[in-house]
Every structure is written in structure tokens, then in C-alpha cells.
């Protein structure tokens, strides 16, 4: 049998010149690394789009490595399962409001199970001038 883990491709940053700018999402990504969180499960979206870039381009998609999920609920459940199997805490990023509401059951399950999950959330662009047409107005 082939080892399937050797065929998994991890997203890696494309080398670019050093940036003159410092982003707030880089600070959040650095904090996740300082906490020694190996993975962060998230459902990608506009709420925290800068964090995606910082995890890949600032941290090289290592510690934490992004695990893309189809739903906020899945992200918390995956983090809970990882913590149970490895005895290490994992992060889950949730969209504010609806994402948090969708994830309430796995958050409750983790609490009942006394399994640590590091949860962060985001709200997206607050400044109306920085919102994209239509999608960030609903």
C-alpha cells in the first residue's frame, strides 16, 4: 500500500520581495505560532481574509498550517477530534454571527468533553468604504 500522507500537497508561499508594510493579521498569525498551535481549521471567507494571507505568506503555512473546511461547525469538530487524538490543542477560526451560531453545538460538545479548542472569530470590514459591493452588505 502507498502512504497517502506523502501525496498531500501543502500550500506554500511564493517568494516575493520583503514588504514595507506590517499587517494586523501578521500579528494574529504570530500569536497563533507563539501558542504552538499546529493547525487552524477554518471555513475561508471575507470575515478574516487577511489572516489567510498571513498564515501562508508570513508564516509559510507552518505552525499553524491551514486546514480548509466546508463549514464553521466542521472546523470546531475537527479541532476537537485532533485534541482528543493528539492531546494537543488546535485552533478553529469562525465567522462572526452566523458562523458562531452554526458552531455552537460542537463548541458545547467540546465543553462537555473537556476538550480544549482555541477559537478565534472575525467580523470582516467595518469601514463601509472598504467593503466589497453586495457580498459584505448582507
List the predicted regions and their residue ranges:
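N-terminal alpha/beta PP-like core and its mobile active-site loop of ThDP/TPP-dependent enzymes
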Residues: 2-138
